C-alpha cells in the first residue's frame, strides 16, 4: 500500500483507502494490533498474516503453556509466557494443542525409512525434566543418517537411559523395524552399552569412535603443560594419506608417548582400529566421519532453541518440542544441498 496524501491523484492509483479494520497478530513477543487498510474497490490482506506457526514455534508455546497450567511456573516463567504473547491459559485449549502436536511429532518419529542409510551418528543431550517431584537430567538420544543419495536425515529420537545397553538395543531395533538398512559405519562416543547394542543390532556395520571425545579422554591423563604437545603428536596420525600410513604413524606416536605419558600411549594403542575406521571410506567423507561433530551441531541448535524452557514439565513435553525442531530441520535438509556428493557416494555401492 502506498501512503499518498488523501487528495493526491496519480495514473498508477487504481483505488483509494477507505479506513482500516483492526486485527490482532500474535507473535513470540506478544500480541500486536495491526490496522489493515480497507479499499473502496477490491480487497487487501497481507498474506503473511495467514501463515500458521511453524511446528517448533507451536511446540515451544505449548510447553510453556503446559508448564504454566500445571502450576510449575516461576516468576521467570510468567515473564516468558508474557513475552511469547500467550493469553488466556485455558486447560482444555492447552490439551487440544498438546494432542495435535503429539500426533504430528509421533507420525514423524514413526515414519518409514525408505532409503538405504550408509552412515549413522548417535549421540544424546541431557536437558532438565521434572520427574516424580524431582528435577533430573534426562537423556534425549538422536540418530542422524546419510542416505544413499548423500542427503542427511533424522532417523529417530527417544528419551531413555543412554548408558544402558538394553535401551540402545530397543532404540536401534525400532529403527530397523521402520526400514533402516544398508548401514556401513556408525559414529558415536565409546559408551560400552551403545557399542554392544551396535554390534548386536547392526551386525556387519563398522564402528567409528568419535575422534574429538577420544582426544579429550586421552588428554585427561596428561599434565596441563603437556596437553598441547601430546595433542599435536596425535593429530599427525589423522594427517596421513591412507589407513596403512595412519597405522604406521600411530605406532610411532605410541613409542614417542610411552616413556613420559604411558597411560596416553596405552589408550591410543588400544583405540587404533576404532579410531581409524573412517579411513576405509571415501576420502571426501573423512572429515565428517571421524567424529560426532555433525550431530553435535544439531544438538547445539536444539539447546539454543529450547533454552527458554530451562526445565521441561515432563518427558512428553521434551519429545514434543525437540521432536518438532528436528522435524523442521529434516524438512530443510530434504530440499537443501547434499551432505555428500552423488559422485563421492558411488564407491560405497
Where are these regions (language model features)?
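RNase H-like nuclease fold core
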Residues: 13-20, 24, 31, 35-40, ...
Amino acid at each position: 500500500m502506498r501512503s499518498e496524501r488523501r487528495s493526491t491523484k496519480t495514473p498508477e492509483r487504481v483505488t483509494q483507502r477507505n479506513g482500516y479494520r483492526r486485527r490482532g497478530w500474535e507473535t513470540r513477543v506478544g500480541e500486536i494490533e495491526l490496522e489493515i487498510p480497507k479499499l473502496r474497490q477490491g480487497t487487501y490482506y497481507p498474506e503473511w498474516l495467514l501463515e500458521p506457526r511453524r511446528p517448533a514455534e507451536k511446540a515451544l508455546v505449548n510447553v510453556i503453556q503446559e508448564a504454566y497450567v500445571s502450576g510449575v511456573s516461576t516468576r521467570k516463567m510468567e515473564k516468558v509466557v508474557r513475552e511469547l504473547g500467550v493469553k488466556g491459559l485455558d486447560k482444555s485449549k492447552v490439551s487440544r494443542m498438546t494432542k495435535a502436536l503429539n500426533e504430528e511429532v509421533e507420525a514423524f518419529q514413526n515414519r518409514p525409512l525408505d532409503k538405504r542409510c550408509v552412515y549413522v551418528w548417535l549421540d544424546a543431550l541431557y536437558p532438565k525434566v521434572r520427574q516424580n517431584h524431582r528435577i533430573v537430567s534426562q537423556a534425549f538420544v538422536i540418530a542422524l543418517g546419510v542416505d544413499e543419495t548423500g542427503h542427511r536425515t533424522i532417523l529417530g529420537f527417544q528419551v531413555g537411559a543412554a548408558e544402558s545397553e538394553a535401551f540402545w538395543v530397543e532404540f536401534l531395533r525400532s529403527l530397523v523395524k521402520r526400514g533402516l538398512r544398508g548401514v556401513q559405519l556408525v559414529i558415536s562416543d565409546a559408551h560400552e552399552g551403545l557399542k554392544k547394542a551396535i554390534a548386536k543390532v547392526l551386525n556387519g556395520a563398522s564402528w567409528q569412535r568419535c575422534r574429538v571425545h577420544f582426544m579429550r579422554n586421552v588428554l585427561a591423563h596428561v599434565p596441563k603443560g603437556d596437553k598441547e604437545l601430546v595433542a599435536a603428536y596425535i593429530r599427525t596420525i589423522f594427517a596421513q594419506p591412507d589407513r596403512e600410513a595412519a597405522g604406521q604413524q600411530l605406532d610411532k606416536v605410541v613409542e614417542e608417548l610411552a616413556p613420559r605419558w604411558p597411560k596416553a600411549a596405552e589408550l591410543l594403542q588400544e583405540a587404533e582400529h576404532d579410531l581409524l575406521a573412517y579411513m576405509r571410506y571415501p576420502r571426501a567423507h573423512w572429515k565428517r566421519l571421524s567424529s560426532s561433530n555433525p550431530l553435535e551441531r544439531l544438538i547445539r541448535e536444539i539447546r539454543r532453541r529450547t533454552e527458554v524452557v530451562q526445565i521441561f514439565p515432563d518427558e512428553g513435553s521434551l519429545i514434543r518440542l525437540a521432536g518438532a525442531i528436528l522435524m523442521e530441520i529434516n524438512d530443510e535438509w530434504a530440499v537443501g544441498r547434499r551432505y555428500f556428493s552423488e559422485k563421492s557416494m558411488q564407491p560405497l555401492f
